[in-house]
A protein has these predicted regions:
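Domain-level detector of nuclease and nuclease-like folds
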Residues: 1-188
C-alpha cells in the first residue's frame, strides 16, 4: 500500500488496530504496527485519542491479561452496525481531496481468548472448553463514546461476531467456548 500524505484530516486519523505499546519487545516488532495492514481510519476526537472510546477499550483489554496470555484479534466492520444501546452507525466515506474516498468503519472489535485461571501450564489448543474463556468486545465507531468505559452491552459471543463479520476466530483452538460468555468473567 502506497503512502498518501493526504490521508489525515477530515476529523479522522490513521488508527492502529494493534497499538504501538503492545509490541515493544524489539524495534522491528514495534515497526510492524505501523504497516498499513494494521491501520484503519478512526475518528480523532472522542474515539482514538486519550479518553476516547477506542482508547478506553484498548486500556481495558490490557487489564484482562492472565499469566498464560491473552490472545487478541482486532478488526473493524464496514456495514450498518447497531450497538448494544440501540444506536445505529451507518456506512460513510471521507474525502481527502483525491480521486478515491476512504470508507469509514462503523464498528471496531476485539475478539479475545484466555485460560480461566492463567496457570494451566498448557497451550490453549490443548485446553478443555471449561478451562477457557472467550468473548468479543465491540464499539460503535462514534465520537459519542468519549469518557465512556466499556460495558457489558458492548460484548457478544465469538459465535455472534463470526456471524456478523463472516470470519472465523480462534480456529486453531477447537474447544474455544465461542457460543457463550459471562460478562462477570471479564469484570463487567
Amino acid at each position: 500500500i502506497q503512502y498518501n500524505s493526504k490521508a489525515t484530516g477530515g476529523g479522522c486519523n490513521k488508527g492502529h488496530m494493534l497499538g504501538s505499546a503492545e509490541r515493544t519487545s524489539s524495534t522491528e516488532t514495534n515497526r510492524q504496527v505501523f504497516y498499513y495492514t494494521n491501520i484503519a481510519p478512526q475518528l480523532s476526537s472522542g474515539f482514538n485519542t486519550g479518553g476516547g472510546g477506542w482508547n478506553l477499550l484498548e486500556d481495558y483489554i490490557d487489564t484482562q491479561v492472565v499469566k498464560d496470555t491473552l490472545y487478541e484479534v482486532v478488526g473493524c466492520y464496514f456495514e450498518t452496525f447497531t450497538d448494544g444501546y440501540g444506536n445505529a452507525v451507518n456506512p460513510k466515506t471521507i474525502s481527502f481531496g483525491g480521486r478515491n474516498d476512504v470508507s469509514m468503519p462503523t464498528m471496531f472489535y476485539y475478539a479475545v481468548l484466555r485460560t480461566k485461571k492463567g496457570n494451566s501450564g498448557k497451550s490453549v489448543k490443548d485446553c478443555k472448553a471449561d478451562e477457557l474463556q472467550c468473548v468479543a468486545f465491540v464499539r460503535a465507531h462514534t465520537n459519542s463514546l468519549k469518557g465512556q468505559e466499556p460495558s457489558s452491552k458492548e460484548m457478544m459471543s465469538i459465535a455472534d461476531l463470526e456471524r456478523l463479520t463472516g470470519f472465523s476466530y480462534f480456529a486453531g483452538v477447537p474447544n474455544a467456548p465461542k457460543d457463550s460468555f459471562k460478562a462477570s468473567d471479564w469484570g463487567l
